[in-house]
Swiss-Prot record:
Chain's gene name: HslU2
One of the protein's GO biological processes: proteolysis involved in protein catabolic process
Any one GO molecular function term: peptidase activity
Protein name (database record): ATP-dependent protease ATPase subunit HslU2
Its job: ATPase subunit of a proteasome-like degradation complex; this subunit has chaperone activity. The binding of ATP and its subsequent hydrolysis by HslU are essential for unfolding of protein substrates subsequently hydrolyzed by HslV. HslU recognizes the N-terminal part of its protein substrates and unfolds these before they are guided to HslV for hydrolysis. The HslVU protease complex functions in mitochondrial DNA replication by regulating DNA helicase PIF2 protein levels.
Length: 496
């Protein structure tokens, strides 16, 4: 498959600040991740973690691949006009809506945030502003950008850290040597001569020799190094100030920016000092400008925003209980989803044109057609997620790469307990989960956690009684552990 020009991906980062070779290398690697990921392959990877919901996987796989296709287009004007097709996932809770989106973002290490629509209010009402969604996305992108830049400069930072530790080690040796010479004058001639010989041999150690032996011969030697310590306490602007303008003015005046760290001299052993020196070296090699430039590129070009419970801010048009604030949230989401420039607290701007928005909701009491028409038009891809059946629950227990039963086996292994689930136990777990969901509130696959924990309660608490033994969980054990749940009429009192 043809590799695309990675320069287009990092163009926005270079527009914000001169992109360093590190930023360019990372954006190139980020862009090339999608080269060999066809929609079919993306769906296949998602199959390893999520059972069923083929239509949902298909939709996000196409959206992810469309990002790659857009970057192949040479005509810049045409490429600018091709926008992501935002997605609306409709289905009950616990069927995999969030997990599909999260795994899709994780597949390409894209910045990802999950928010609930009910947490936001219309501008002018008490509550969070929808533009804070982009602030959260940018914060997530900065974390990823910082980590990637540090990985890119890891070898260089390690070399610099060794130099810092070596200089501290050498200074410490020199100081102890000058102190020792004055005290040894009154001591035994033979012993002082031997000490002088050892001291002299260490004083003559070169940096290359130190690099070879710092893990063995010199690891317990003491060194003195300077490290940067961040001041304790809240260094952010007053939380009650929500105005972007006030924050920007504060930053310009030096009131709202993050406080710089204070240099502190510490004495450590060589093996303890090296991690501190490495972090110190990384802080020199990776500056805030590089992090911000890369974070902006990642957020704008690869960001994914998952808005859950979108149906909770939708009311029937003729309803007497229509909430004007909830309708206003839909209105406020329009420019965000359509594409606009959002001003962040630090005064910089993030374009939402190419951010992928995935909205989801159960839509039990309202219909998707009850959303305001403009919002419907900005969510052109709609996917119906089906409720989980007993067979789906059974597959969820066994098929995902890191399924619940595998997790329980690994946890018990740490207690030297060999745990085994028989096939009829898996069937019984699926049956109980399905029945409880049918008789109580249906929370989908999340119910499995409650049922499995009820079964494992005895072995988790009394683990010392089963140490060194093999524990076999069959259908009878499951029935005994969950019998009180199944025999109760009002299951809601006992289940989440």
């Amino acid at each position: 498959m043809i590799r695309f020009s990675w320069v287009r991906l990092c163009s926005s980062a270079m527009a914000a600040a001169a992109a360093s070779p590190d930023v360019q290398a990372i954006t190139r690697a980020q862009a090339m991740q999608l080269d060999d990921l066809s929609p079919r392959k993306i769906a296949s990877i998602l199959d390893s973690y999520i059972v069923g919901q083929a239509e949902g996987k298909r939709a996000v796989a196409i959206s992810l691949r469309n990002r790659w296709r857009r970057r192949q287009i040479e005509d810049e004007g045409l490429r600018r006009d091709i926008l992501p097709k935002n997605i609306l996932l409709v289905g009950p809770t616990g069927v995999g809506k969030t997990e599909i989106s999260r795994r899709m973002a994780k597949l390409t290490e894209a910045p990802f945030v999950k928010v609930e629509a009910t947490k936001y209010t219309e501008v002018g009402f008490k509550g969070k502003d929808v533009e804070s969604i982009i602030e959260d996305l940018y914060s997530n992108a900065k974390t990823k950008a910082k980590r990637r830049l540090e990985i890119e400069r890891e070898k260089e930072a390690h070399e610099l850290a060794l130099e810092i530790v070596f200089n501290g080690w050498h200074s410490c040796r020199s100081a102890s040597g000058s102190f020792g010479s004055s005290t040894r004058n009154s001591g035994s001639g033979d012993s002082s001569a031997e000490e002088d010989k050892n001291s002299s041999s260490r004083d003559n150690v070169t940096f290359e020799e130190f690099k070879e032996k710092y893990k063995t011969q010199f690891k317990d030697d003491m060194v003195v190094i300077d490290v940067t310590q961040q001041p304790k306490g809240n260094t952010k602007p007053n939380a009650s100030i929500n105005s972007v303008e006030m924050l920007s003015v504060g930053i310009l005046l030096g009131l709202g920016s993050e406080s710089r760290g204070v240099k502190t001299r510490v004495t450590k052993r060589v093996e303890e000092a090296l991690p501190l020196a490495t972090q110190e070296a990384l802080s020199r090699l990776v500056d805030e400008t590089q992090i911000s430039a890369l974070a902006r590129t990642l957020a704008e070009q690869d960001g994914v925003v998952f808005i859950d419970e979108i149906d909770k801010v939708v009311t029937e048009p003729a309803s007497a209980n229509a909430d004007v604030s909830s309708t206003g949230v839909q209105q406020d989401l329009l420019p965000l989803i359509e594409g606009s420039n959002v001003t962040l607290k630090d005064g910089s701007q993030i374009s939402t044109d190419n951010i992928l928005f995935i909205c989801s909701g159960a839509f039990h009491t309202v219909k998707t057609s009850d959303m305001i028409a403009e919002l419907q038009g900005r969510l052109p891809v709609r996917v119906e997620m089906h409720a989980l059946k007993e067979e789906d629950i059974r597959r969820i227990l066994c098929e995902p790469k890191f399924n619940l039963l595998l997790q329980q086996k690994a946890l018990m292994k740490t207690e030297n307990i060999d745990l085994e689930f028989t096939p009829d136990a898996v069937d019984e777990l699926a049956r109980v989960t399905t029945k409880v969901n049918a008789n109580a509130q249906n929370i989908g696959a999340r119910r499995l956690h409650t049922v499995v924990e009820r079964v494992m309660d005895e072995y988790s608490f009394n683990c010392q009684d089963y140490e060194g033994k093999k524990v076999v969980i069959d259908a009878e054990v499951v029935r005994k552990a969950t019998g009180s749940l199944m025999n109760n009429i009002d299951l809601a009192k006992y289940i989440l």
